[in-house]
Amino acid sequence: MDPEATGLENIFLRGHLLGMTKGEIEASIDDIAEFTDLGDFLELPMKTYSAGMAARLAFGISTAMQNDILLIDEGIGAGDAAFQEKAHKRIEDLFTRTRIVLIASHSTNLIETFCNRRVELGHGRVERDERI
């Protein structure tokens, strides 16, 4: 994400990096805006966003676009309880349209809720690999 660019410009930037057409990106903007609840903040440079706002936008962009593989690194820990509930629903939807979702998290509850396999690492080595 470019901190000098607006939220809207970052939506286009990330979409282009993912190989989307301008039309595909434009079609996803309303969904991203509604999901993130950023409203007029999408018109402001990202350097004015709080860390939580930036995380919500990054998560909203990544999950609004069609992906074969989605990597989430503590992505749904940002925001209040209402946003986290929206994020959980979004992840549930991702499982129906994304082939592989990889979540890096310290949250046992998150892993047990959304994952069918858990791999735990310690000091760069696999310590546990199990189906859950």
Where on the chain are the PLM-derived regions?
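Conserved ABC ATPase signature
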Residues: 45-49
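H-loop/switch region of ABC-family ATPase nucleotide-binding domains
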Residues: 105-106
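Helical segment within the ABC ATPase nucleotide-binding domain
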Residues: 84-96
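Conserved ABC ATPase "signature" region
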Residues: 12, 24-41, 58-60
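A short, proline-enriched helix->beta-strand linker immediately N-terminal to the Walker B motif
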Residues: 63-72
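H-loop (His-switch) and adjacent beta-strand-loop-beta switch element
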Residues: 114, 118-130
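ABC ATPase nucleotide-binding domain "signature motif"
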Residues: 50-57
